[in-house]
Structure formats: structure tokens, C-alpha cells
Amino acid sequence: MAKKSMIAKSERPAKFSTQEYTRCERCGRPHSVYRKFHLCRICLRDLAHKGQIPGMKKASW
């Protein structure tokens, strides 16, 4: 889990537009966040395995 202070800091408006960055909406992780889902790779994988993301299924080939 991310620090509460860093999550609060990311919610405030940035001084410059280049300072804005994405965070996972579920856990607050700043790295490896998918823009389409607003989730980090770990949370996305977890929800996909549980079947909570419509249209997403495990790949097999």
C-alpha cells in the first residue's frame, strides 16, 4: 500500500501539468498503471483472475 501522504499529495492539483502522474485506484501504486483501467498490473491481474473485469480472460495458446 502507498503512503497516505503520497496519495493525498497526488490528489492535489499539480503546479505544472508535467508533474501529474497516475496512481492505481485500488492500492495507490504509482508504477505500472494501465490508463484504460486505472489499475496497476498486480491489481489488474488479481481482478482478471477473479473474473471481475468483463471481457478479460486468461490467455492460452
From Swiss-Prot:
It comes from Limosilactobacillus fermentum (strain NBRC 3956 / LMG 18251) (Lactobacillus fermentum). Zn(2+) binds at residues 24, 27, 40, 43. Keywords: Metal-binding, Ribonucleoprotein, Ribosomal protein, RNA-binding, rRNA-binding, Zinc. GO terms for molecular function: rRNA binding; structural constituent of ribosome; zinc ion binding. NCBIfam families: PRK08061.1. This is Small ribosomal subunit protein uS14. Its cofactor is Zn(2+). InterPro entries: Ribosomal_uS14, Ribosomal_uS14_bact, Ribosomal_uS14_CS, Ribosomal_uS14_sf. Binds 1 zinc ion per subunit. GO terms for cellular component: small ribosomal subunit. Binds 16S rRNA, required for the assembly of 30S particles and may also be responsible for determining the conformation of the 16S rRNA at the A site. It holds the Pfam family Ribosomal_S14. Belongs to the universal ribosomal protein uS14 family. Zinc-binding uS14 subfamily. It comes from the Bacteria. GO terms for biological process: translation. Part of the 30S ribosomal subunit. Contacts proteins S3 and S10.
